[in-house]
């Protein structure tokens, strides 16, 4: 805690402006000159730790809101989806394991399923970079394993950055691990490299 993980995501998404430095997406897009909405439009999506789904609406309606985000809420729900949009929704629902739950109120879903629903909503916005904040906090072991597989699948299609304290979960998904300490990068590399790094051992294990 306090290493700077959430602040890093806040800076990338435009919620917080840094005192100094530069933030580029790819080689050319200077994020410091963009608003939060513009940053989302260039392809950066964020999922917060606590699920923020509409619990009284069905899974289908929540996904519809993600598809039709350029209209007012009730207008979005009344709008007819095109065949292509329905296909995209079904594909996302299948990918997150909720295809059979489309008509269920989101409030009836388990904690893990709500997390998956929000990931599905993010998917429908077609981000090139997904920022996922502590996705498995409060999940059952089975949900954690399903989430690990989901994030691995997503990483084959786009860049995915996950902030997480559960090291076993990190080990199961990460290709590259970055350790932050007091707002700075302390170490980066494979899980084995990071765990063997003397600086990480000193700071986080007190040895």
Regions found by a protein language model. Name each.
Residues 13:
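Helix-to-loop junction immediately C-terminal to a conserved catalytic motif
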Residues 22-42, 81:
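ABC ATPase NBD Q-loop/coupling interface
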Residues 32-33, 92-108:
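Conserved ABC nucleotide-binding domain
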Residues 130-134:
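Catalytic Walker B motif of ABC-type/P-loop ATPase nucleotide-binding domains
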Residues 144-156:
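Helical segment within the ABC ATPase nucleotide-binding domain
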Residues 170-172:
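A short, surface-exposed alpha-helical micro-motif characterized by mixed small hydrophobic
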């Amino acid at each position: 805690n306090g290493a700077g993980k959430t602040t890093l995501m806040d800076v990338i998404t435009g919620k917080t402006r840094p005192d100094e430095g530069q933030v580029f997406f790819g080689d050319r897009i200077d994020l410091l000159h963009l608003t939060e909405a513009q940053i989302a439009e260039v392809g950066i999506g964020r999922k917060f730790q606590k699920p923020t789904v509409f619990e009284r609406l069905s899974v289908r309606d929540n996904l519809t809101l993600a598809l039709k985000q350029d209209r007012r809420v009730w207008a979005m729900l009344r709008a007819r989806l095109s065949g292509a949009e329905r296909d995209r929704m079904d594909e996302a629902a299948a990918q997150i394991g909720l295809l059979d739950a489309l008509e269920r109120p989101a409030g009836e879903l388990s904690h893990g399923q709500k997390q998956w629903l929000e990931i599905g909503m993010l998917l429908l916005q077609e981000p090139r970079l997904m920022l996922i904040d502590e996705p498995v906090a409060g999940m059952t072991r089975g949900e954690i394993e399903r989430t690990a597989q989901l994030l691995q699948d997503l990483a084959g299609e786009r860049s995915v950055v996950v902030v997480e304290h559960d090291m076993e979960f990190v080990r199961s998904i990460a290709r590259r691990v970055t350790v932050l300490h007091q707002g700075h990068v302390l170490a980066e590399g494979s899980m084995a490299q990071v765990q063997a790094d003397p600086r990480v051992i000193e700071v986080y294990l007190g040895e």
